[in-house]
């Protein structure tokens, strides 16, 4: 998944950018995930609001916008800035940690460690490459590329390459590009591919070759350019669209490919399509109906609250049907 949300280009872009910056600060510096989620939810709701927000009171009528966030919106609308953010930006340690976490492979803990050692900028990282692991070096190498959003038009071209090459390896493979792209987003942060094969189930032995054969094919056609990590069920790497007729080079992009057992595939597709907030709402509804859902299975809950055996699932719609919830197309899941 992408490291950072791009600035919003909406009616209330200033407000959503402010909330996203606060969210990143809470996650990366304070490691306060509940506050991170609260700011993100508010930003997501406001991004879809069809009118220009004129006050915190107006924003507060929206789900997920509480009193404290409404007060921050009032301050931002009145002054064009937020004292809390100004303070964060002026604090060298906070701003440096926040910045370094934008490098793929550098999480909040690693960023804090680097800052404690006086490593605060890209230039500092380049001078201290011996202190970086393989993933972080690749993240540094392609930092500028990874910062760029991927336009939907490019994502569609990337999808065409992946799906066609997968079928060349074996026509029985099933692959789905998930994330915000599947929900119809105009741009994406990275490419998230789920992969399965009828011969691989949760009962069968591990079959890493099913994943590795696909990765090797995508390397052979020079779509995958770098490997960050390659396990038995997950590949993390870098890809690039081929340039046409000596046109300018396309940026390098992050790609993850996950191999999922066939019987767990559609629970995985549902989970990795998102959005996070939609998934939380769906899980809450499932619990009310006596089921528990995660990225692997849907299981009934007994009277004692203990989950039973996984239920058979052959499509996303099956999961909606079990919990008696009206099916929603991926484009309607961006909550």
UniProtKB/Swiss-Prot annotation:
- Record EC number: 2.7.7.7, 4.2.99.-, 4.2.99.18
Chain intervals for the UniProt region annotation (DNA-binding): 183-192
Give binding positions for Na(+) 2.
101, 103, 106
UniProt modified residues of type Omega-N-methylarginine: 83, 152
Q: What is its main location?
A: nucleus
PTMs?
Methylation by PRMT6 stimulates the polymerase activity by enhancing DNA binding and processivity. Ubiquitinated at Lys-41, Lys-61 and Lys-81: monoubiquitinated by HUWE1/ARF-BP1. Monoubiquitinated protein is then the target of STUB1/CHIP, which catalyzes polyubiquitination from monoubiquitin, leading to degradation by the proteasome. USP47 mediates the deubiquitination of monoubiquitinated protein, preventing polyubiquitination by STUB1/CHIP and its subsequent degradation.
GO terms for cellular component: cytoplasm; nucleus
| Residues binding Mg(2+) 2, per UniProt | 190, 192, 256
Amino-acid positions noted as binding Na(+) 1 in the UniProt annotation, renumbered to this chain: 60, 62, 65
User: For this chain's UniProt record, which GO biological process terms are given?
Assistant: base-excision repair; DNA damage response; DNA-templated DNA replication; double-strand break repair via nonhomologous end joining
Q: Where is the active site?
A: 72
**How cofactor binds (record note)?**
Binds 2 magnesium ions per subunit.
**Where does the source fall among the domains of life?**
Eukaryota
Q: Where is this cross-link: Glycyl lysine isopeptide (Lys-Gly) (interchain with G-Cter in ubiquitin)?
A: 41, 61, 81
Q: What is this protein called?
A: DNA polymerase beta
Write the gene name.
Answer: POLB
Keywords on record? Acetylation, Cytoplasm, DNA damage, DNA repair, DNA replication, DNA synthesis, DNA-binding, DNA-directed DNA polymerase, Isopeptide bond, Lyase, Magnesium, Metal-binding, Methylation, Nucleotidyltransferase, Nucleus, Potassium, Sodium, Transferase, Ubl conjugation
Q: Which residues bind Mg(2+) 1?
A: 190, 192
